[in-house]
Each structure stands twice: as C-alpha cells, then as structure tokens.
Amino acid sequence: MNKIDNPAATIFEKTAIYKEINRYSKYYKHFKFRSKGELALSYYVIDAFTDTKFGGNPAGVVINENLDEEFMQKFAEEVRFSETAFIKKIDSKNFDIKFFTPTAYVELCGHATIASFQALFDSGAIEDNNTYFMKTLAGTLAVEVN
C-alpha cells in the first residue's frame, strides 16, 4: 500500500508552513507530499541546536503508524537529509523510532532524536516535564522533555 514501485516516476506536490518554536530547535518547516494520489505524507524538517532559521543541524521527522522499512528508506533517499526519523506511537509514553540516512537504516541519531521529540511536542502527542521512552536499533532509551 505504501510501496513506491518507481520512485523516479513519483511526482510530489509540496506545500510549506513555517512556524517559530522556542525549544531546542527554534524553527521548523512542515511539508506534505502526495505521491500520485496514493499516499499523503506529512513530515517536519526541524533544525536542532539553533535559535536561528536555517541554522543548526536539520533532520526530517515523519510521524506515521503504517510505513514499511522499504518505504522509509526510499523516502529518506528522496528527501536527502543526513538523517530522517520515522516515529510510531506505541502508547502515551513509548515510541518506536527508526533513523534512516539516504543509504542506510542506522541505530541512533542525536539531533534527529531532539527533532523527533520536538515534532511530537508540537503535534500534541507529548507534554512538557515528562519522561518518555524510545525504542531504537540501539535499544530502549529514556528521553526527558522539559
């Protein structure tokens, strides 16, 4: 269902919304991609470690429950960030997060972790002053949001 058989032929429509935020990453961009009417996918581009637009270290973040790893890899290759994080909510305190470079599925990424929890916070999925857990290839790690 989410599989792209011919990524070279995929046509994407982009719309961007810019919003300032006042946490680890001050600026983010939110895009929506539509692939030939089959899949609408929203993702964030969050600049970690900065308080200025287009500064810091950018990471892509996708919050989606139903993406397979083949699609995640192709998407990361398409958007070409050093890392793109794909988040699946397990329950209110636990998240499965997969990190992809344009060429590989990797164990962990620091700036993409910060970007992931910023996206979760901005989307209302998590709250300030709480501890959450993320399952990654590197194991299950605690993340404090405050």
Give the location of each predicted region.
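N-terminal, positively charged, Ser/Thr/Ala/Gly-biased leader segments
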Residues: F33-F54
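Anion-binding (especially nucleotide phosphate/pyrophosphate-binding) glycine-rich loop
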Residues: K74-V106
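Polybasic, lysine-rich low-complexity intrinsically disordered segments
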Residues: N2-I4, K14
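Short beta-strand-to-turn element immediately C-terminal to the catalytic PLP-Schiff-base lysine
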Residues: V61-N64, I87-K88
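Short, conserved charged micro-motifs
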Residues: L67-Q73, L108
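Aromatic (phenylalanine/tyrosine) cluster motif
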Residues: F12, Y18, Y24-F33
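Acidic, low-complexity central loop/insert segments
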Residues: N94, F100-N146
